[in-house]
Amino acid sequence: MAHWRTPSRIFLVGPMGAGKSTVGRELANLLGLEFIDSDAAIEARTGVSIPWIFDIEGEAGFRAREAAVIDELTGRDGVVVATGGGAVTTPANRDLLGARGVVVYLYTPVSVQLQRTRHDTNRPLLQSDDPEARLQSLLAERDPLYREVADVVVETTGGRARSVARRIVEALQGQPS
């Protein structure tokens, strides 16, 4: 059996509430890589919150900022990057993610997303009268995009972040290098 080499760039995609940030930290720790959350990077650069950007610039303004950050982060080596849930809606982001590293789709059913995000006021797209319907709509729109760009798909239900991170490593080890 050939020796497995840790990818130098791992990008996590998936819906809000999938655990991209939590699992990403664990995965980076397991593999000795740096963890970067693209939304946190946007907030650090702008000095304002994601909801503020949505309020002032709208989703299009946010997506433009996100695309610039994705372009930069996907060029770094030795990283696990957790992308925002909607990063895949921009074709250029999908191209960069797919071309520059290994993409892991953290699949999470809507019921689990709802449970994990129900008290989070920092998610502009969930500020609606029916968050469950909104999550279902977003997943219906984005699931094909996540799957299109993903090298591997790992479900995040039924396990702690560390066990999900281990499942990702196992899935990656099964990938051709």
Curated annotation (Swiss-Prot):
One of its GO terms (biological process) is amino acid biosynthetic process. It is an enzyme of class 2 (transferase). It is found in: Cytoplasm. Pathway: Metabolic intermediate biosynthesis; chorismate biosynthesis; chorismate from D-erythrose 4-phosphate and phosphoenolpyruvate: step 5/7. Binds 1 Mg(2+) ion per subunit. Its EC number is 2.7.1.71. Disulfide bonds: none annotated. It comes from the Bacteria. PROSITE patterns: SHIKIMATE_KINASE. It catalyses: shikimate + ATP = 3-phosphoshikimate + ADP + H(+). Gene3D superfamilies: P-loop containing nucleotide triphosphate hydrolases. Keywords: Amino-acid biosynthesis, Aromatic amino acid biosynthesis, ATP-binding, Cytoplasm, Kinase, Magnesium, Metal-binding, Nucleotide-binding, Transferase. The keyword Iron does not apply. PANTHER family: SHIKIMATE KINASE (PTHR21087), SHIKIMATE KINASE 1, CHLOROPLASTIC (PTHR21087:SF16). NCBIfam families: PRK05057.1 (NF003456). This is Shikimate kinase. It comes from Halorhodospira halophila (strain DSM 244 / SL1) (Ectothiorhodospira halophila (strain DSM 244 / SL1)). The lineage of its organism: Bacteria, Pseudomonadati, Pseudomonadota, Gammaproteobacteria, Chromatiales.
